[in-house]
Amino acid sequence: MRIEKRQVEGQPLTVIVEYPEWNNSVQSLIGKIEKMDLSFVGRSEDRSVSIGISDIYYIENVERKLFLYTKDEVFRLDGTMPDIESRIFDTGLVRISRTCIMNTDKLREIKQIRNSHLEAVLDNDEKLIVSRKYLPEIKKVFRKEGV
């Protein structure tokens, strides 16, 4: 595989994938590239903002309301956890508890804190509780990424 990188000012990010034959690896690569463009619309007071996957730290369900957390802002989301889960497949966002979805790209470390719980520490020093029930999903993401 050959990778070429080139900065072109004033142009949107463009990715061209050239391949000798269509196969699962090519399909997976294109799927991941397309997922990078996925975004959610979050509301904060009187404004609505489009938030890309790469800006999301975690999504939390609090008293039947969804909140999306970025590095330093919180937005209200419409929908339900199952709605969100159906959109985030293969993006690095994974369910870590009944009420929380975390972006594994923002994960700094996981450590055990109690018998059945783990603590995820994110790049912004936010700490989230990880249920052991969801640990296999997190491990699966790390295996895919070669971590």
Language-model-detected regions and their locations in the chain:
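C-terminal structural segments of small proteins and small subunits
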Residues: 129-132, 136-137
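Conserved residues at beta->alpha junctions
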Residues: 19-20, 71, 98, 132
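N-terminal regulatory/sensing modules of transcriptional regulators
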Residues: 1-27
